């Protein structure tokens, strides 16, 4: 019999009711401080990997014990994941970093069938979990005790302003015919078994994003990875796997004219994607992350029903919040438009959750796609039968490669 070493949980909880603290996610009014310790079952003497395939933690939330089960999100990166940035003289620098032993997880709460979790374990635990219908955020505290974490509700992060935050959607692309009404396609409103589909996503961060994060490529990389991990979690309810296949950072200058006029920027991004990006990187959809303030309180813009179109399978998203969860909701929303989803009503709820396809973004207990969004997506599949999302982006063991100029090099090249 294999001897098993059990690392037990020891944690203390110190609620700071009514206190305020400045965290990476913003100024938080009400939070708990916890010291989570991992439960690990390994054969005696076994070498523990840096990031295990499965992990388990215990927390106390509102005084009640919570067991958090986490599983590495092996769908997060495609087999040919790459990263591109630019040298000061404009040369493309492209690498294929090894991401097999990454630190991004999805999971659930024990004894809560409706629970979900999307967590980064890169430096402590950071992300969110849904418990009894309520969304909680967790992130490390910068204290002398490195094990301290804050747990808080999204609603307890102070609002930066009260202005309405809206999404734009364009339906007047001449190259794409309008989507038929659901009633024309004889959809079954009770049908929940959607087919498995796969989206290989490219995220492009513009030069303002690069400057906003102090020209730190690693900070931008981590932020985008966490956002896509959240998006991947949202789309599991639709049986869609979203994998990041490329991250491009415009580190020297923007490759297109970025304007506050969101429609003009979207048009320019569409042209660049078709004439440049698609010629060097196979993918299904590209989203532009920009730090410019878009016009008319717009947080994002995307054409409707254009997934797999060589020009229009795109969206733009303003980097509007330090809360990665809200950024994930915004980008998932724009991606939803590409998949044929129209806006829900402004007060749409699915149970206690806010609908992801609401026209405006507000903080809520949790976020989900509505039944209407599922039906819009299903009718898009029936009408257009998009082919690019049929292939499964299987993971392989990539090898980190040195770089010279704008070319990918073989491992070990000098």
UniProtKB/Swiss-Prot annotation:
Top EC class, one word: hydrolase
Cofactor note: Binds 1 zinc ion per subunit.
Residue numbers binding Zn(2+): 333, 337, 343
Residues annotated for Ca(2+) binding in this entry: 200, 284, 388, 391
Co-factor requirement: Zn(2+)
EC number of the protein: 3.4.24.42
Disulfide bonds: 308-388, 348-355
UniProt-listed CDD domains: ZnMc_adamalysin_II_like
Stretches assigned to the Peptidase M12B domain: 197-393
Propeptide stretch(es), residue numbers: 21-190, 394-414
GO molecular function: metal ion binding; metalloendopeptidase activity; toxin activity
Subcellular location: Secreted
Record's protein name: Snake venom metalloproteinase atrolysin-D
